[in-house]
Amino acid sequence: MKQAYQYLFNLINEKEIVVVGCSGGPDSMALLYMLNKIRSVKNIYLVCAHVNHNIRMVSKEEQLFVENWCLDHDIVFETMTIQKYGDDNFENEARTIRYKFFDDIVRKYNANYLMTAHHGDDLMETILMRIVRGSTLN
């Protein structure tokens, strides 16, 4: 975690705006925690963007957990709840909706960064998505 913190600290400049995609899971909460620590030193502006996928009994509880954490730490909280999914591949549709929401929030705040926490499987998914779209891996 020290290496991740140091990387983020070196990456982000004073007074930049960072949108954090936060599910409420351990990876995204660790990212939000680290960015909040950096905020106290570099005076960055943090916006937490949470998507309630509305698919599990605890979805609302997760949303409230993240919302309350942000409130306790004076972080702007933006959320959306997905009410209905189509008949297509659920994971693809959820991902498309989630990143459209993140893009909207980045534009709303004119953010310098959108940050999401990835574990190994997520990272592979990101690499594959970039290859399919013809993007670079940087």
Task: State what each model feature region is.
Residues 1-22, 26-138:
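Core alpha/beta nucleotide-donor-binding catalytic domains of modification enzymes
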